[in-house]
Amino acid sequence: MSGRQGGKAKPLKAAKKTEKDLSEEDVEFKKKQQEEAKKIKEMAAKAGQRGPLLGGGIKKSGKK
């Protein structure tokens, strides 16, 4: 057999992330996305406090 022996093989090293040069448009776009995500999260929290919207009305029993 080859030189490799039993056991777990070492994982390959991931390349280091380099800082990207972002243009002003990219920075504005990221900021806008973060603000929208924050708004959606706040709206979801408000909706969760109220409880279910449906559930009223006449409930039918299974009997006939």
UniProtKB/Swiss-Prot annotation:
Keywords: Coiled coil. It comes from the Eukaryota. Residues 28-44 have a biased composition (Basic and acidic residues). Pfam families: TMA7. Residues 53-64 have a biased composition (Gly residues). Residues 21-50 form a coiled coil. Residues 1-64 are annotated as: Disordered. The keyword Iron does not apply. Belongs to the TMA7 family. This is Translation machinery-associated protein 7 homolog. It comes from Caenorhabditis elegans.
